[in-house]
Protein backbone atom coordinates (compact mmCIF):
# COMPACT_ATOMS: atom_id res chain seq x y z
CA UNK A 1 0.00 0.00 0.00
CA UNK A 2 2.75 2.43 1.02
CA UNK A 3 4.87 1.44 -1.98
CA UNK A 4 1.93 2.03 -4.31
CA UNK A 5 1.41 5.48 -2.79
CA UNK A 6 5.08 6.35 -3.21
CA UNK A 7 5.07 5.20 -6.84
CA UNK A 8 1.87 7.13 -7.54
CA UNK A 9 3.32 10.28 -5.96
CA UNK A 10 6.49 9.90 -8.03
CA UNK A 11 4.47 9.54 -11.22
CA UNK A 12 2.61 12.77 -10.42
CA UNK A 13 5.74 14.91 -10.39
CA UNK A 14 4.59 16.52 -13.61
CA UNK A 15 1.44 17.90 -11.95
CA UNK A 16 2.88 21.04 -10.31
CA UNK A 17 4.83 22.14 -13.42
CA UNK A 18 1.81 21.47 -15.64
CA UNK A 19 -0.52 23.49 -13.40
CA UNK A 20 1.85 26.46 -13.25
CA UNK A 21 2.84 26.41 -16.93
CA UNK A 22 -0.69 26.04 -18.27
CA UNK A 23 -2.25 28.06 -15.47
CA UNK A 24 -0.12 31.11 -16.21
CA UNK A 25 -0.92 31.10 -19.94
CA UNK A 26 -3.94 33.48 -19.61
CA UNK A 27 -1.85 35.82 -17.44
CA UNK A 28 0.87 35.87 -20.05
CA UNK A 29 -1.55 36.44 -22.92
CA UNK A 30 -3.20 39.33 -21.05
CA UNK A 31 0.21 40.95 -20.48
CA UNK A 32 1.09 40.52 -24.14
CA UNK A 33 -2.30 41.89 -25.28
CA UNK A 34 -1.86 44.96 -23.10
CA UNK A 35 1.56 45.60 -24.58
CA UNK A 36 0.25 44.98 -28.10
CA UNK A 37 -2.42 47.67 -27.61
CA UNK A 38 -0.06 50.16 -25.97
CA UNK A 39 2.57 49.72 -28.68
CA UNK A 40 0.16 50.04 -31.62
CA UNK A 41 1.49 53.48 -32.55
CA UNK A 42 5.09 52.78 -31.57
CA UNK A 43 7.93 51.61 -33.83
CA UNK A 44 7.69 47.92 -34.73
CA UNK A 45 11.19 47.28 -33.41
CA UNK A 46 10.20 48.51 -29.95
CA UNK A 47 7.18 46.21 -29.91
CA UNK A 48 9.35 43.27 -30.99
CA UNK A 49 12.00 44.01 -28.38
CA UNK A 50 9.49 43.98 -25.53
CA UNK A 51 7.66 40.95 -26.96
CA UNK A 52 10.97 39.08 -26.99
CA UNK A 53 11.50 40.03 -23.34
CA UNK A 54 8.01 38.82 -22.41
CA UNK A 55 8.61 35.56 -24.27
CA UNK A 56 11.90 35.17 -22.42
CA UNK A 57 10.07 35.45 -19.08
CA UNK A 58 7.65 32.64 -19.93
CA UNK A 59 10.29 30.38 -21.44
CA UNK A 60 12.55 30.83 -18.43
CA UNK A 61 9.70 29.42 -16.37
CA UNK A 62 9.59 26.46 -18.77
CA UNK A 63 13.33 25.97 -18.31
CA UNK A 64 13.03 26.17 -14.53
CA UNK A 65 10.88 23.07 -14.55
CA UNK A 66 12.57 21.18 -17.38
CA UNK A 67 16.12 21.87 -16.15
CA UNK A 68 16.27 22.96 -12.52
CA UNK A 69 13.25 21.01 -11.26
CA UNK A 70 14.13 17.76 -13.05
CA UNK A 71 17.84 18.03 -12.30
CA UNK A 72 18.66 16.63 -15.74
CA UNK A 73 22.38 16.56 -16.47
CA UNK A 74 23.08 18.32 -19.76
CA UNK A 75 26.21 17.21 -21.59
CA UNK A 76 27.17 19.57 -24.39
CA UNK A 77 29.54 18.44 -27.14
CA UNK A 78 30.96 21.18 -29.35
CA UNK A 79 31.57 24.89 -28.94
CA UNK A 80 28.34 26.83 -28.45
CA UNK A 81 28.97 30.53 -29.18
CA UNK A 82 28.47 32.78 -26.18
CA UNK A 83 27.26 35.67 -28.31
CA UNK A 84 23.84 36.03 -29.93
CA UNK A 85 23.55 35.19 -33.62
CA UNK A 86 20.85 35.09 -36.28
CA UNK A 87 20.60 31.39 -37.04
CA UNK A 88 18.58 28.49 -38.37
CA UNK A 89 18.58 25.66 -35.84
CA UNK A 90 18.32 22.18 -37.42
CA UNK A 91 17.88 19.12 -35.20
CA UNK A 92 16.73 15.52 -35.18
CA UNK A 93 13.14 15.16 -33.97
CA UNK A 94 12.10 12.39 -31.60
CA UNK A 95 10.26 13.88 -28.61
CA UNK A 96 7.84 16.65 -27.63
CA UNK A 97 10.71 17.91 -25.46
CA UNK A 98 12.82 18.74 -28.53
CA UNK A 99 11.56 22.33 -28.76
CA UNK A 100 12.61 22.88 -25.14
CA UNK A 101 16.13 21.66 -25.96
CA UNK A 102 16.32 24.54 -28.44
CA UNK A 103 15.33 26.86 -25.58
CA UNK A 104 18.10 25.37 -23.44
CA UNK A 105 20.78 26.26 -25.97
CA UNK A 106 19.34 29.69 -26.74
CA UNK A 107 19.22 30.55 -23.03
CA UNK A 108 22.95 29.89 -22.78
CA UNK A 109 23.50 32.54 -25.46
CA UNK A 110 21.08 35.01 -23.88
CA UNK A 111 18.94 34.61 -27.03
CA UNK A 112 15.89 32.91 -25.53
CA UNK A 113 13.49 35.66 -26.59
CA UNK A 114 14.62 35.32 -30.21
CA UNK A 115 13.52 31.68 -30.56
CA UNK A 116 10.81 31.15 -33.18
CA UNK A 117 9.59 27.85 -34.58
CA UNK A 118 8.48 26.29 -37.83
CA UNK A 119 5.51 24.23 -36.65
CA UNK A 120 3.03 21.69 -37.95
CA UNK A 121 -0.08 23.44 -39.20
CA UNK A 122 -2.43 21.60 -36.83
CA UNK A 123 -0.64 23.05 -33.79
CA UNK A 124 -2.13 26.47 -34.51
CA UNK A 125 -5.39 25.24 -32.94
CA UNK A 126 -3.79 24.84 -29.51
CA UNK A 127 -5.71 27.05 -27.05
CA UNK A 128 -3.92 30.39 -26.54
CA UNK A 129 -0.50 28.98 -27.44
CA UNK A 130 -1.30 28.42 -31.10
CA UNK A 131 -2.30 32.05 -31.62
CA UNK A 132 0.55 33.53 -29.63
CA UNK A 133 3.30 31.48 -31.28
CA UNK A 134 2.21 32.98 -34.60
CA UNK A 135 2.36 36.49 -33.13
CA UNK A 136 5.85 35.86 -31.82
CA UNK A 137 7.10 34.82 -35.24
CA UNK A 138 6.24 31.15 -35.45
CA UNK A 139 5.36 29.79 -38.88
CA UNK A 140 2.79 27.04 -39.38
CA UNK A 141 3.41 24.85 -42.41
CA UNK A 142 1.60 22.02 -44.14
CA UNK A 143 3.32 19.02 -45.63
CA UNK A 144 4.23 18.12 -49.21
CA UNK A 145 1.98 19.57 -51.92
CA UNK A 146 0.06 21.74 -49.44
CA UNK A 147 3.22 23.53 -48.32
CA UNK A 148 2.77 27.28 -48.90
CA UNK A 149 6.26 28.57 -49.56
CA UNK A 150 5.04 32.05 -50.56
CA UNK A 151 3.40 32.64 -47.19
CA UNK A 152 6.45 31.44 -45.29
CA UNK A 153 8.81 33.46 -47.47
CA UNK A 154 6.71 36.61 -47.07
CA UNK A 155 6.65 36.34 -43.28
CA UNK A 156 10.37 35.68 -42.99
CA UNK A 157 11.29 38.52 -45.32
CA UNK A 158 9.16 40.89 -43.26
CA UNK A 159 11.23 39.94 -40.21
CA UNK A 160 14.46 40.42 -42.13
CA UNK A 161 13.33 43.87 -43.32
CA UNK A 162 12.48 44.81 -39.73
CA UNK A 163 15.85 43.59 -38.46
CA UNK A 164 14.19 41.07 -36.14
CA UNK A 165 16.64 38.79 -34.31
CA UNK A 166 16.08 35.22 -35.49
CA UNK A 167 16.73 31.88 -33.82
CA UNK A 168 14.55 29.86 -36.17
CA UNK A 169 14.01 26.25 -35.10
CA UNK A 170 13.29 23.68 -37.83
CA UNK A 171 12.96 19.91 -37.55
CA UNK A 172 13.58 18.82 -41.18
CA UNK A 173 12.27 15.27 -40.63
CA UNK A 174 8.78 16.79 -40.39
CA UNK A 175 7.58 14.28 -37.81
CA UNK A 176 9.02 12.56 -34.77
CA UNK A 177 11.28 9.54 -35.23
CA UNK A 178 10.14 6.51 -33.27
CA UNK A 179 11.86 3.14 -33.65
CA UNK A 180 8.57 1.34 -32.98
CA UNK A 181 6.89 3.03 -35.96
CA UNK A 182 8.27 0.53 -38.44
CA UNK A 183 5.99 1.59 -41.30
CA UNK A 184 7.07 5.22 -40.99
CA UNK A 185 10.74 4.25 -40.85
CA UNK A 186 10.41 1.88 -43.82
CA UNK A 187 8.62 4.53 -45.89
CA UNK A 188 11.32 7.07 -45.06
CA UNK A 189 14.09 4.66 -46.01
CA UNK A 190 12.31 3.72 -49.24
CA UNK A 191 11.93 7.42 -50.08
CA UNK A 192 15.70 7.88 -49.72
CA UNK A 193 16.58 4.73 -51.67
CA UNK A 194 14.33 5.70 -54.59
CA UNK A 195 16.18 9.01 -54.88
CA UNK A 196 19.65 7.55 -54.63
CA UNK A 197 20.23 8.92 -51.14
CA UNK A 198 21.85 7.11 -48.24
CA UNK A 199 19.37 5.11 -46.16
CA UNK A 200 19.30 6.32 -42.56
CA UNK A 201 18.76 4.21 -39.44
CA UNK A 202 18.25 6.44 -36.40
CA UNK A 203 16.73 9.48 -38.12
CA UNK A 204 14.16 9.99 -40.85
CA UNK A 205 14.97 11.27 -44.32
CA UNK A 206 14.97 15.09 -44.03
CA UNK A 207 12.68 17.20 -46.22
CA UNK A 208 14.16 20.28 -47.82
CA UNK A 209 11.31 22.74 -48.41
CA UNK A 210 11.09 24.62 -45.11
CA UNK A 211 14.87 24.70 -44.67
CA UNK A 212 15.47 26.01 -48.18
CA UNK A 213 12.76 28.68 -47.98
CA UNK A 214 14.06 29.81 -44.59
CA UNK A 215 17.66 30.02 -45.76
CA UNK A 216 16.81 31.64 -49.09
CA UNK A 217 14.60 34.24 -47.41
CA UNK A 218 17.05 35.15 -44.66
CA UNK A 219 20.51 34.48 -46.12
CA UNK A 220 21.50 38.15 -45.93
CA UNK A 221 20.36 38.22 -42.29
CA UNK A 222 21.85 34.93 -41.08
CA UNK A 223 25.17 34.30 -39.39
CA UNK A 224 25.12 30.52 -39.27
CA UNK A 225 23.29 27.22 -39.24
CA UNK A 226 23.24 25.32 -35.95
CA UNK A 227 23.28 21.56 -36.56
CA UNK A 228 22.14 19.88 -33.33
CA UNK A 229 21.85 16.17 -32.53
CA UNK A 230 20.07 15.14 -29.33
CA UNK A 231 19.92 11.92 -27.32
CA UNK A 232 17.78 11.42 -24.23
CA UNK A 233 19.79 9.00 -22.12
CA UNK A 234 17.72 6.37 -20.39
CA UNK A 235 15.90 5.12 -23.47
CA UNK A 236 18.69 2.96 -24.90
CA UNK A 237 18.46 -0.81 -24.71
CA UNK A 238 21.57 -1.79 -26.61
CA UNK A 239 21.92 -3.69 -29.90
CA UNK A 240 20.58 -0.69 -31.77
CA UNK A 241 17.21 -0.81 -30.05
CA UNK A 242 15.70 1.68 -27.65
CA UNK A 243 12.34 2.54 -26.21
CA UNK A 244 10.41 5.70 -26.92
CA UNK A 245 12.12 8.96 -25.96
CA UNK A 246 10.42 10.67 -23.01
CA UNK A 247 7.29 12.73 -23.48
CA UNK A 248 7.06 16.09 -21.71
CA UNK A 249 5.27 14.54 -18.73
CA UNK A 250 7.77 11.67 -18.52
CA UNK A 251 10.65 14.13 -18.70
CA UNK A 252 9.12 16.12 -15.82
CA UNK A 253 8.86 12.85 -13.88
CA UNK A 254 12.66 12.66 -14.15
CA UNK A 255 12.78 9.70 -16.51
CA UNK A 256 15.69 11.24 -18.41
CA UNK A 257 18.79 11.52 -16.16
CA UNK A 258 21.08 12.85 -18.90
CA UNK A 259 20.62 14.86 -22.07
CA UNK A 260 23.38 14.60 -24.68
CA UNK A 261 23.53 17.52 -27.12
CA UNK A 262 25.99 17.49 -30.02
CA UNK A 263 26.44 20.98 -31.46
CA UNK A 264 28.00 21.97 -34.77
CA UNK A 265 28.08 25.55 -36.04
CA UNK A 266 28.14 25.93 -39.84
CA UNK A 267 28.91 29.33 -41.29
CA UNK A 268 26.29 30.71 -43.63
CA UNK A 269 28.78 30.88 -46.51
CA UNK A 270 29.37 27.12 -46.33
CA UNK A 271 25.73 26.30 -47.15
CA UNK A 272 24.79 25.84 -50.84
CA UNK A 273 22.00 28.16 -51.96
CA UNK A 274 20.48 26.26 -54.89
CA UNK A 275 17.69 23.94 -53.73
CA UNK A 276 18.95 20.68 -55.24
CA UNK A 277 22.44 21.26 -53.89
CA UNK A 278 21.03 22.19 -50.50
CA UNK A 279 18.92 19.03 -50.54
CA UNK A 280 22.06 16.94 -50.95
CA UNK A 281 23.85 18.99 -48.28
CA UNK A 282 21.00 18.57 -45.80
CA UNK A 283 20.90 14.82 -46.33
CA UNK A 284 24.66 14.67 -45.77
CA UNK A 285 24.18 16.51 -42.47
CA UNK A 286 21.63 13.88 -41.45
CA UNK A 287 24.04 11.13 -42.48
CA UNK A 288 26.46 12.66 -39.97
CA UNK A 289 23.70 12.65 -37.34
CA UNK A 290 22.96 9.02 -38.12
CA UNK A 291 26.61 8.04 -37.70
CA UNK A 292 26.74 9.88 -34.38
CA UNK A 293 23.64 8.03 -33.18
CA UNK A 294 24.92 4.67 -34.43
CA UNK A 295 28.12 5.29 -32.48
CA UNK A 296 26.08 6.27 -29.40
CA UNK A 297 23.75 3.26 -29.45
CA UNK A 298 25.57 0.53 -31.36
CA UNK A 299 29.32 0.99 -30.92
CA UNK A 300 31.01 -2.42 -30.38
CA UNK A 301 33.35 -0.66 -27.95
CA UNK A 302 31.56 -0.23 -24.58
CA UNK A 303 33.83 2.74 -23.80
CA UNK A 304 32.47 4.63 -26.81
CA UNK A 305 28.83 3.73 -26.27
CA UNK A 306 26.28 6.05 -24.64
CA UNK A 307 28.20 9.19 -25.51
CA UNK A 308 29.09 11.26 -28.54
CA UNK A 309 32.69 11.44 -29.83
CA UNK A 310 34.82 14.20 -28.38
CA UNK A 311 34.87 16.10 -25.13
CA UNK A 312 31.65 17.00 -23.33
CA UNK A 313 30.94 19.84 -20.94
CA UNK A 314 28.41 19.56 -18.12
CA UNK A 315 26.35 22.69 -18.75
CA UNK A 316 24.16 24.14 -16.00
CA UNK A 317 21.60 26.93 -16.12
CA UNK A 318 21.50 28.92 -12.90
CA UNK A 319 18.25 28.86 -10.95
CA UNK A 320 18.79 32.59 -10.41
CA UNK A 321 18.01 33.03 -14.09
CA UNK A 322 14.83 30.95 -14.15
CA UNK A 323 13.17 31.13 -10.73
CA UNK A 324 12.22 34.86 -10.97
CA UNK A 325 9.96 34.04 -13.93
CA UNK A 326 8.14 31.40 -11.88
CA UNK A 327 7.63 33.87 -9.04
CA UNK A 328 6.48 36.70 -11.31
CA UNK A 329 3.98 34.74 -13.40
CA UNK A 330 2.86 32.60 -10.47
CA UNK A 331 2.23 35.65 -8.28
CA UNK A 332 0.36 37.57 -10.98
CA UNK A 333 -1.85 34.55 -11.66
CA UNK A 334 -2.53 34.01 -7.95
CA UNK A 335 -3.48 37.67 -7.46
CA UNK A 336 -5.88 37.48 -10.40
CA UNK A 337 -7.56 34.37 -9.00
CA UNK A 338 -8.10 35.95 -5.58
CA UNK A 339 -10.97 38.16 -6.71
CA UNK A 340 -14.22 37.34 -8.47
CA UNK A 341 -13.57 39.85 -11.23
CA UNK A 342 -10.06 38.45 -11.66
CA UNK A 343 -11.39 34.91 -11.95
CA UNK A 344 -13.91 36.02 -14.56
CA UNK A 345 -11.16 37.74 -16.53
CA UNK A 346 -8.98 34.65 -16.20
CA UNK A 347 -11.64 32.23 -17.42
CA UNK A 348 -12.76 34.67 -20.10
CA UNK A 349 -9.21 34.80 -21.43
CA UNK A 350 -9.07 31.01 -21.67
CA UNK A 351 -12.43 30.85 -23.45
CA UNK A 352 -12.55 33.96 -25.63
CA UNK A 353 -8.81 34.03 -26.21
CA UNK A 354 -9.02 30.52 -27.65
CA UNK A 355 -12.09 31.31 -29.78
CA UNK A 356 -10.68 34.59 -31.09
CA UNK A 357 -7.36 32.92 -31.85
CA UNK A 358 -9.09 30.23 -33.91
CA UNK A 359 -11.20 32.89 -35.64
CA UNK A 360 -8.04 34.82 -36.48
CA UNK A 361 -6.58 31.78 -38.25
CA UNK A 362 -9.85 31.15 -40.12
CA UNK A 363 -10.03 34.76 -41.35
CA UNK A 364 -6.33 34.78 -42.23
CA UNK A 365 -6.78 31.64 -44.32
UniProtKB/Swiss-Prot annotation:
Record's bilayer topology term: Multi-pass membrane protein
Keyword annotations of the record: Acyltransferase, Endoplasmic reticulum, Lipid biosynthesis, Lipid metabolism, Membrane, Mitochondrion, Nucleus, Phospholipid biosynthesis, Phospholipid metabolism, Transferase, Transmembrane, Transmembrane helix
EC number: 2.3.1.51
Pfam name, any one: Acyltransf_C
Record carries keyword Iron: no
Disulfide bonds: none
CDD domains: LPLAT_LCLAT1-like (cd07990)
First-tier enzyme category under EC: transferase
GO MF annotation list: 1-acylglycerol-3-phosphate O-acyltransferase activity
Positions of short motif HXXXXD motif: 93-98
Pathway this chain belongs to: Phospholipid metabolism; CDP-diacylglycerol biosynthesis; CDP-diacylglycerol from sn-glycerol 3-phosphate: step 2/3
Annotated catalysed reactions: a 1-acyl-sn-glycero-3-phosphate + an acyl-CoA = a 1,2-diacyl-sn-glycero-3-phosphate + CoA; 1-(9Z-octadecenoyl)-sn-glycero-3-phosphate + tetradecanoyl-CoA = 1-(9Z)-octadecenoyl-2-tetradecanoyl-sn-glycero-3-phosphate + CoA; pentadecanoyl-CoA + 1-(9Z-octadecenoyl)-sn-glycero-3-phosphate = 1-(9Z)-octadecenoyl-2-pentadecanoyl-sn-glycero-3-phosphate + CoA; 1-(9Z-octadecenoyl)-sn-glycero-3-phosphate + octadecanoyl-CoA = 1-(9Z-octadecenoyl)-2-octadecanoyl-sn-glycero-3-phosphate + CoA
Family recorded in the similarity comment: Belongs to the 1-acyl-sn-glycerol-3-phosphate acyltransferase family.
Task of the protein: Converts 1-acyl-sn-glycerol-3-phosphate (lysophosphatidic acid or LPA) into 1,2-diacyl-sn-glycerol-3-phosphate (phosphatidic acid or PA) by incorporating an acyl moiety at the sn-2 position of the glycerol backbone. Acts on LPA containing saturated or unsaturated fatty acids C15:0-C20:4 at the sn-1 position using C18:1-CoA as the acyl donor. Also acts on lysophosphatidylethanolamine using oleoyl-CoA, but not arachidonoyl-CoA, and lysophosphatidylinositol using arachidonoyl-CoA, but not oleoyl-CoA. Activity toward lysophosphatidylglycerol not detectable.
Name of the protein in its database record: 1-acyl-sn-glycerol-3-phosphate acyltransferase epsilon
Species: Mus musculus (Mouse)
The gene coding this protein: Agpat5
